[in-house]
């Protein structure tokens, strides 16, 4: 469910040493399943443990997860990263904004999941995103660009070499093409004008 690297485990163990006996960590998602989802880690004293919590046991501490956060923390990864400014704890939870879908889910749901979890985070660096409108009977994904992608001079490149390539590779044999229906208008919002 949640992978915590050995270096991050050692970090948590050290942080917990001076705490009240029985204190562990809590990993959680605020606003799970929404675009505003945020993940966090906090101390969890014994009196804050709920009977419905999921408990993961690590070397020297436990990680507790509330029942609402559990499906959104599937495949989460916690690490302690060395940077120029020091060390930083990172928590990556690819399913925080959207619950992971099953392999046998309808194509529309699986494509939407890949867009939200893999593609939109890449486009967000330019203030952009895509929205899946529908999948046609001939298995063409109809999308619409928004934010910094709308009117961007590089949108055709993003569509063909980015979005379409990634979706066709991911859904080989199921998805035939990706078509953009955006009425692009260049403006101050466009990343590349």
Curated annotation (Swiss-Prot):
| InterPro entries cross-referenced by the UniProt entry | Fe/S_biogenesis_protein_NfuA, FeS_biogenesis, FSCA_dom_sf, HesB-like_dom_sf, NIF_FeS_clus_asmbl_NifU_C
What keywords appear on the UniProt entry?
4Fe-4S, Iron, Iron-sulfur, Metal-binding
Residues folding into a coiled coil are: none
- Superkingdom is Bacteria
Q: Does the keyword 4Fe-4S apply?
A: yes
> For this protein, what is any one GO molecular function term?
iron ion binding
Name of protein: Fe/S biogenesis protein NfuA
């Amino acid at each position: 469910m949640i992978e915590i690297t050995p270096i991050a485990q050692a970090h948590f163990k050290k942080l917990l040493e001076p705490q009240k006996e029985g204190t562990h960590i809590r990993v959680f998602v605020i606003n799970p399943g929404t675009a505003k989802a945020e993940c966090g880690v906090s101390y969890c004293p014994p009196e804050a443990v709920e009977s419905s919590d999921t408990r993961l046991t690590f070397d020297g501490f436990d990680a507790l997860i509330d029942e609402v956060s559990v499906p959104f923390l599937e495949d989460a990864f916690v690490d302690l990263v060395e940077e120029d400014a020091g060390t930083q704890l990172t928590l990556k939870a690819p399913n925080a904004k959207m619950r992971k879908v099953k392999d046998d889910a309808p194509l529309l749901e699986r494509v939407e999941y890949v867009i939200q979890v893999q593609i939109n985070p890449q486009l967000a660096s330019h203030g952009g995103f895509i929205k899946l409108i529908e999948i046609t009977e001939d298995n063409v994904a109809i999308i619409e660009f928004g934010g910094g992608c709308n009117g961007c001079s590089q949108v055709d490149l993003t569509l063909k070499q980015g979005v379409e390539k990634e979706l066709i590779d991911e859904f080989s044999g199921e998805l035939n093409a990706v078509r953009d229906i955006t009425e692009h208008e260049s403006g101050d919002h466009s990343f590349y004008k």
